[in-house]
């Protein structure tokens, strides 16, 4: 009887220790501002902002090219948070808290690795960049050879 009571007391604690919302972003790097800051967005196909998901040595390489961010990040920095919970990958890049500048700048590339995905499994990718902007989610199958490119303007 004591074992049953002990088991019933320990079971909820053990169930609460499952792996959820674990940070899994590694090697985050970015190129900084490309050229001068501006007060309006750039245009043209050569400036297309792309989000690329790529299989890399058992991990997911997430790369964003030509992202337009508030130029306050140059002084305050950027944060990248990634988590894998079940079949959902949440990936968030944002400027550190601080006063916003009255300008924007184009970041040629920012990239990091997301670990902990299972080969052959379908995932939903939830992406946000900058304060409060969430792109529509999409699904992908994590497998060798994966190279998925999304134009963020059409997401």
Where are these regions (language model features)?
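Exposed, flexible binding/inhibitory loops of compact, secreted disulfide-stabilized domains
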Residues: 17-155
